[in-house]
Amino acid sequence: MKESTHKLMTLDFWRICIANFLLYAAVWMLLPILPAQCYLMGLNTQEISVSFLLFVGGMIGVGPLHAFLGDAFKRKYVLLLFTLAVALCFSGWLIVTAVWEVKLLMMLAGASFGIATTAGITIGIDITQSHRRGVGNRIYAFSGALGLLVGICCLSPLYLLLVFKNLVIISLVLFLLSLVVVTSIYVAFRAPVGVGIFNIDRFFLSLAWVPAINVCILSFGIGLLHNLLPPYAWIGILMVVVLAALTAPLTRLFVKLSHHCQRGTANTTLQLATQTGLILGLVEGERIANNLLFGCITILLAVLMFVTVTWPYFKQKRVRP
C-alpha cells in the first residue's frame, strides 16, 4: 500500500535517498583511484586527462535528453536502467586493456551516471508533497553529497590495502544495493506531456550560470587538494567534508534562482558543477607540482568570487523569496 506523502520523510523518500547515497558512494570510491590505475596500465598523463574529460563530456552531452527520457519513459525504470549501465561500465575495468577501451568506458559511464542522477532527483521530487519539496530537495542533494564523501574519504583509501579488483567488486555491491532499494520505491504514474527529444529542461538552470561557475571553481580547488600526500592529506579530506556540508545551503541558493517546476533542474545544475570541478581537479592534480598552493589559491578565488560576484548576482536575480 502506498504510504501517505503528507509528511516529508516517508518510507519511499528514505529509500530514494539511500539509493542515491549508494550510487554516489559506488561511483566516487573508484573515480579518485582510476588515474593511478591508468598509470599502471601504461596510459600517459594526456591520455588519462582525455579519458576523464570524456567522463565529464558524457555527463554534459546527455543533458538535453534528460527531459525527454523522464517524460517518455517511467522514471523509475530510467533510474534502474542507467544505474545498471554505470555499474556495467565500471565492471569493465576488470577486463579493459587498451586506451580506446578506457576512453569509451569513461564516456559511457559519465553519460549513464548523468542520466541516473537526474532521474533520481526527479523521482525524489515526484514522491514528495509539493509544499515540502524545497526541504526534500536539500535532503536528497545531501544524501548524494554524503555518498560522495564516504566514497572519496572512506572507501577509495582502501586502494592502499586491497587490490583494484576487490575495490571494483565492492563498488559493484554498492551498485547492486542501490538497484535493490530503487525497485522497492513506489512512483505514481504520470502521463507524458510530449517533451521534445532535445531540451535543456531538468538539465541546466540558465539563471544559475554564475553560481555554477563559482561552485565548479571551488570544487576544482578541492579536487586539487585531495591529491595531497601525508602529512597534508587531511587538508583534502577536510575540504571534501566542507563541500558536502555546503550542499544543502547551495541547493537552496540554486533553487531560489529557479521558476516553478525547476527545483530538479536547480539540483541537477549544482550536481553537474560540483562533480565537473572535482573530477577536473582530481585529474589535473596528477600534473601540478604544488597542489597545496594551487588548491588553496583556487579556493580563495572561489570565495572571493562568491562575495564580489555570485552573491550580488543572486540578490539581483533570485526568483523565489
Residue ranges, per PLM feature:
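Helix-loop-helix hairpin linking two adjacent transmembrane segments in secondary transporters
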Residues: 139-184
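Conserved MFS/SLC helix-loop-helix module at the cytosolic interface between two early adjacent transmembrane helices
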Residues: 61-94
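C-terminal transmembrane helical hairpin of 12-TM major facilitator-type secondary transporters
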Residues: 230-250
